[in-house]
Structure formats: C-alpha cells, structure tokens
C-alpha cells in the first residue's frame, strides 16, 4: 500500500549528518582534512600552526598599477621578486606609490598579498609588465643568463631557444654553434654575437607563460621558481631531452 505523501519525515541536525558522513567515509577507507570535532561550531581547541605563506620567499614588489578600490581605498597590481608572481594587495598608505615603483614585499604600506591571474590585470598593469620583468631579470642576471648558457634540445626536432619569440630552428642552431662550450658571461655578449635582444626575448617568453598556464615547458618554473621550492640551484634539475 502506498504511503501518504503527508507522512512525517525525520529531520537531523547538521552535526548528526556530518558525523554519519564521516563514519561512512572512513569505513570505505577515505580520509578527510578535518574530523567532526574540528567542524563543530564554537570549538575552542587550539588551532594548528600555520605553514609558510605562499609569498614568504618574495623580497620586493614592482608596482604595475595603483587603482581605486570600491567602495573606497586603493589596491595595487604587482610583480613579485624574485619568483615573478602576479599579485594584488590592498593599499594601507598610498604615499609615493606609483606605476613602476619598487618596494619591499613586507612593507606596511600594503595589506596581505594574493595571487592574481594575468587576464585579471588592469590594462595599465598589463602594459607595464614586460618592462617590470626586464627589470627583475637585470637585477638577477646570473640566474636568467643560465637559460642561454645551458638550454638544450627539448626534443629531436625542437631546441629550447625556439621557445623565445621569433627564434626559429635555423637561428636556434646558429646560437648553439656560437655558444659552443664556453658560453656567455653577460647578456650583452649574447646580444652582440647573436644579433638579438636577449633580455627582452626572455621577458616576452615569461609574459607568454603568465598569459597561458598550459604551456608545457615553463621557463618561469625551470629557471626561477624551482630553487624557491626546493632550495636546489637553477638548472640542476632541468634535464631536457637531447
């Protein structure tokens, strides 16, 4: 016999439902980040120690844009150093902040940093980005020059130099032949013998990787960020296919 649709339905509080879910989840071998006690309202247990913040290793910020923040105040779009993350922050004290200025990452004039996607940058910030990256490369030239001195074949048909804008297979082969074993000690040497603007080409490649996170070979990770994550010198973990 079919039950009446008006029959009463038992209701359960959220803690009971959560406890049941956790029991079922664990019975199937699952693991969760929090147990039911952690999720109870009003829990007075001691919080776990916070891990390192994502931008703890950053020392400076290059201001790409200062813009009004609704309903009031300002925020900045920045490029961090040395890892070259795109970040934003609330402005506590505008002072002399302007496009192109460089400040310490832990400066009190800014609030906490948060990452921003390239597509969410303001038009002004996007226009400043390449020059800001060139500035970062120039400040830490040895790290970035390593690309020109150690780049190898990515595959049987493609050399890493071909990741740079405008560099084709013939030009890449020419650069490899010029480099030989000794390599270069400064960017100016690369420019003179190869007829390129080595810093700008590298900066433009970095911008492309920021625009498109799906790039399979990311020089930003290989050259810049791997050391920040692992403490290993750049290039020691970059093994390209020859």
Identify the residue ranges that each predicted region occupies:
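C-terminal extensions
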Residues: 3, 31, 140-163, 177-242
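Structure-specific DNA junction-binding interface
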Residues: 1-139, 233-242
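Small-residue hinge/turn detector
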Residues: 168-169
């Amino acid at each position: 016999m079919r039950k009446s649709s008006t029959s009463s339905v038992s209701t359960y509080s959220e803690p009971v439902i959560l406890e049941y879910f956790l029991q079922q989840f664990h019975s199937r071998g699952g693991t969760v980040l929090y147990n039911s006690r952690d999720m109870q309202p009003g829990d007075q247990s001691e919080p776990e120690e916070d891990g390192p913040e994502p931008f703890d290793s950053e020392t400076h910020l290059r201001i790409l844009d200062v813009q009004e923040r609704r309903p009031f105040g300002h925020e900045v779009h920045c490029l961090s150093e040395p890892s070259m993350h795109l970040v934003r922050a609330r402005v506590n004290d505008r002072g002399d902040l302007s496009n192109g200025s460089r400040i310490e990452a832990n400066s009190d004039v800014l609030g906490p940093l948060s990452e921003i996607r390239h597509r969410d940058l303001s038009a002004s910030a996007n226009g400043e980005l390449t020059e800001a990256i060139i500035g970062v490369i120039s400040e830490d030239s040895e790290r970035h020059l390593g690309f020109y001195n150690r780049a190898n074949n990515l595959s049987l048909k493609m050399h890493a130099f071909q990741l740079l804008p405008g560099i084709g297979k013939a030009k890449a082969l020419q650069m490899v032949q010029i480099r030989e074993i000794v390599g270069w000690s400064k960017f100016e040497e690369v420019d003179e013998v190869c007829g390129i603007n080595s810093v700008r080409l590298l900066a433009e490649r970095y911008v492309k990787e920021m625009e498109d996170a799906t790039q399979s070979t990311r020089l930003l990770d290989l050259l810049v960020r791997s050391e920040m994550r692992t403490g290993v010198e750049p290039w020691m973990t970059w093994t390209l296919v020859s």
